[in-house]
């Protein structure tokens, strides 16, 4: 499909924005600038990071790093999606579930992923399982809260109309509640996927020999500064791409929402 002029303009603007960021990074790092409390004296310039990236691409460990991280993120995300959406639908529709579950979940929600590391090691003997658990915790609450928000945001007039027409509870859920809450659920899934990658470095600090987060942390310990930025950029690109894929799939599964939003 041919790109429209507005899409070309948008892509061009984004490319210019990225180029400007790289240019600023180059100037600050090569000049070893000091901006108040922030110094760029030890920040490698883009050219050095580019060389480190090419070195990683040519390394046989790249596939092992990527496959390990992708498996951990996928396992944590799928588990969080099943539990988060299920609990969110239950809490959103059931007053008793809300009273019983929401308060404990709200207490646990602000705890950062790094604080779960000691407990994850104690609860889960497998280091691989512990790493998956950290990514699971990171993704769970964005998915859960967005699902609850989506269910609570269903127009009560739609529910009342469906009930007045004799719609059964299961059909009411499948034909009114779930489609109305779906856009918010997809948003939660997209945010949750991004949070999974955000927690990856924390998760792979536990143990392991492979993974993009482990590669980033190991680069810091050996003071390979360019490799740190390479790892950060890889995590950022993978997180952005996977979140965009979820958003794209959600739009294709929700033609009613896409039409209302005016986007294809």
What are these regions (language model features)?
Residues 146, 150-189, 212, 216:
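Short cytoplasmic-facing helical segments at TM-TM junctions of multi-pass membrane proteins
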Residues 1-19, 244-264:
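Transmembrane alpha-helical segments of polytopic membrane transport and secretion proteins
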Residues 75-105:
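Transmembrane-helix boundary motif in ABC transporter permease subunits
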Residues 3, 31-78:
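Periplasmic/extracellular loop-to-transmembrane helix junction in inner-membrane transport proteins
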Residues 30, 34, 89, 99-103, ...:
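Membrane-spanning helices that line or support transport/gating and their immediate boundary helices
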Residues 213-250:
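Hydrophobic alpha-helical transmembrane segments of polytopic membrane proteins
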Residues 133, 137, 169-202, 230, ...:
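Transmembrane alpha-helices
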Residues 106-142, 149-150:
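Generic hydrophobic transmembrane alpha-helix motif, especially the helices
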């Amino acid at each position: 499909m041919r790109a429209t002029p507005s899409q070309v303009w948008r892509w061009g603007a984004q490319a210019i924005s990225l180029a400007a960021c790289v240019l600023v990074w180059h100037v600050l790092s090569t000049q070893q600038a000091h901006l108040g409390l922030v110094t760029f004296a030890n920040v490698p310039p883009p050219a050095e990071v580019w060389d480190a990236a090419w070195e990683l691409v040519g390394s046989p460990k790249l596939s092992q790093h990527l496959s390990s991280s992708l498996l951990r993120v996928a396992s944590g995300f799928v588990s969080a999606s099943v539990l988060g959406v299920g609990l969110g639908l239950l809490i959103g529709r059931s007053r008793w579930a809300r009273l019983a579950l929401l308060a404990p979940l709200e207490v646990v929600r602000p705890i950062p992923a790094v604080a779960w590391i000691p407990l994850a090691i104690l609860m889960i003997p497998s280091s691989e399982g512990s790493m998956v658990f950290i990514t699971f915790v990171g993704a769970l609450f964005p998915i859960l809260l967005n699902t609850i928000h989506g269910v609570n945001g269903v127009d009560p007039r739609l529910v009342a109309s469906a009930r007045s027409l004799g719609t059964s509870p299961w059909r009411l859920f499948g034909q009114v509640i779930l489609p109305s809450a779906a856009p918010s659920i997809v948003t939660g899934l997209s945010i949750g996927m991004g949070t999974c990658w955000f927690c990856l470095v924390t998760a792979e600090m536990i143990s392991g020999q492979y993974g993009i987060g482990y590669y980033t942390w190991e680069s810091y310990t050996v003071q390979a500064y360019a490799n740190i930025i390479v790892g950060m950029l890889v995590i950022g690109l993978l997180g952005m791409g996977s979140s965009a894929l979820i958003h794209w799939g959600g739009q294709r599964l929700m033609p009613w929402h896409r039409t209302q939003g005016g986007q294809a």
